[in-house]
Amino acid sequence: MASSPITDFYAGRNVFITGATGFVGVTIVEKLLRDVPNVGTLYLLMRAKKGKSVQERLEELKKNSVFDKFKELQLQSRLSKIVPIEGDVGLEHLGISPKDRQTLIDNVNVVFHSAATLDFFQSLKETTNINLRGTRRVVELCQQIKNLDALVHVSSAYVNAYLTKVEEKLYPAPEDPEKIIQLSETLNDDALKELEPKLLKDHPNTYTFTKHLAEHEVANVASKFPCGIVRPSMITAAWKEPIPGWTISKNGPQGFFMGASKGVLRRLPLDPSIIMDYIPIDVVVNGIITTGYYVNSLQAKNGGRPADLQIFHLTSSTYKPFRFELMTDKINSYLHDYPLNSAVWYPNLRLVKSLWVFRLSAILFHFIPAIILDLVTKIGGGRPILVRLHKNVWNSLNTLEKFIFTEWHFDSKRLLALSKTLNIVDKKKFFIDIGELAWDEYFSNTILGVRQYLSKEPIKNLEKARRKDKILLGLHVALQLSFWYGVFKLIVCLTGISTAKAALVLPVLYYLFGLL
């Protein structure tokens, strides 16, 4: 049987992972434990949170749905390889105690840095501290590690969002990192906010700006030890592993599928004709793990000297492009294949190309129903949240507009070339080539995954939910008929025209209303 060079590389090696409790980090942990039986210790940077110690949070992490298959595969014992390291990338020296730091220095061989703040609305002071300085702190630790074989930094395809065609290379820093750090230390948030337009230049927000600068922190040490940067685009549910459709992230399509399946999200500001760059989480994780192996192998080929910094795009836009126009009708079909028992209305998602048309339609289809449902919820003793939810979406649209209506083309030739260097075993086990991905099947699985892992509805209540879906359809049709009958009577009453003429006006109104 052919061997797996990637598995062989990680066998016996100890790995330090930041951001380990996040979507990417926890999936890295699962993949290494499942497919690299002899991997060494996995040190996870974790912080005490909400009154829970890191040990308590680790026990919670082990119960994450990403590990659901471990019981079936009898792999629970491998979870003992996980060791929590209390710390925080936002603190000096990563907030790690001297004893734990020495443990990492003495034992770690590979570092995966995936910790970051993903909030597009966070202040420059905070994003600088976590994304830029946090990366610098990780790099400083890496320089102290005695036997470091690879550092892989998880960046983002959107760090160069001011370009619509992006290559797998390092672009010039938009500003001097030292200057940004100094300003963030000396100025308050309000003063920094005033300087933001001048500092960010063409960057749409503080996230892409500070993540771009963070890449240069890694580039500065690429001559000292093997380094790689991976740039995922919008990370979505699992394609194949650990379970097709698995997700714990509400970002991107998972979030709006969740709202649509509830029946509360009915319009979405999105141009179905533009390419949306989505990449499954399992492909991202395989890309990270493969990069760690690859940058180390280059050093061996280079006479023990680190090769140039390696940058790879984990993206789909130029290789397996996806547009919603390919499956607009299918999305609603999938929502009814896997309906929610907790749905409050019949799901019917429509995409709206124009932001101002979306705002108008949101008043009719989001806010008015939300006010009614929140009132009913409040009367019933529940906590009304729908109006607040839709307000948050409304207020964020101006900031998100660039990401909603811009088509990017992220070149991924280097990643595909990397895939071709792998042997047949690693191509299958650590797949990074999405050439065989079928988007329609993928999104069907994603909607089922959203149902199971985000909405927390088990498969066993699916038939019950489908019966409810049919009832909601009947109510939906009845409400529409009642509404248009009321409009018809109102036209006759207000204008005094005959019912025959009113019947001619009604289709025109129906058509115009349908544009919203």
Curated annotation (Swiss-Prot):
<dbReference type="InterPro" id="IPR036291">
    <property type="entry name" value="NAD(P)-bd_dom_sf"/>
</dbReference>
<dbReference type="GO" id="GO:0016020">
    <property type="term" value="C:membrane"/>
</dbReference>
<dbReference type="GO" id="GO:0012505">
    <property type="term" value="C:endomembrane system"/>
</dbReference>
<keyword id="KW-0444">Lipid biosynthesis</keyword>
<keyword id="KW-0443">Lipid metabolism</keyword>
<feature type="transmembrane region" description="Helical">
    <location>
        <begin position="496"/>
        <end position="516"/>
    </location>
</feature>
<feature type="transmembrane region" description="Helical">
    <location>
        <begin position="356"/>
        <end position="376"/>
    </location>
</feature>
<feature type="transmembrane region" description="Helical">
    <location>
        <begin position="471"/>
        <end position="491"/>
    </location>
</feature>
<keyword id="KW-0521">NADP</keyword>
<dbReference type="InterPro" id="IPR013120">
    <property type="entry name" value="Far_NAD-bd"/>
</dbReference>
<dbReference type="Pfam" id="PF03015">
    <property type="entry name" value="Sterile"/>
</dbReference>
<dbReference type="GO" id="GO:0035336">
    <property type="term" value="P:long-chain fatty-acyl-CoA metabolic process"/>
</dbReference>
<dbReference type="GO" id="GO:0080019">
    <property type="term" value="F:alcohol-forming very long-chain fatty acyl-CoA reductase activity"/>
</dbReference>
<comment type="similarity">
    <text>Belongs to the fatty acyl-CoA reductase family.</text>
</comment>
<keyword id="KW-0560">Oxidoreductase</keyword>
<keyword id="KW-1133">Transmembrane helix</keyword>
<dbReference type="InterPro" id="IPR033640">
    <property type="entry name" value="FAR_C"/>
</dbReference>
<keyword id="KW-0812">Transmembrane</keyword>
<dbReference type="GO" id="GO:0102965">
    <property type="term" value="F:alcohol-forming long-chain fatty acyl-CoA reductase activity"/>
</dbReference>
<dbReference type="GO" id="GO:0010025">
    <property type="term" value="P:wax biosynthetic process"/>
</dbReference>
<protein>
    <recommendedName>
        <fullName>Putative fatty acyl-CoA reductase CG8306</fullName>
        <ecNumber>1.2.1.84</ecNumber>
    </recommendedName>
</protein>
<comment type="function">
    <text>Catalyzes the reduction of C16 or C18 fatty acyl-CoA to fatty alcohols.</text>
</comment>
<dbReference type="InterPro" id="IPR026055">
    <property type="entry name" value="FAR"/>
</dbReference>
<dbReference type="Pfam" id="PF07993">
    <property type="entry name" value="NAD_binding_4"/>
</dbReference>
<dbReference type="GO" id="GO:0005777">
    <property type="term" value="C:peroxisome"/>
</dbReference>
<keyword id="KW-0472">Membrane</keyword>
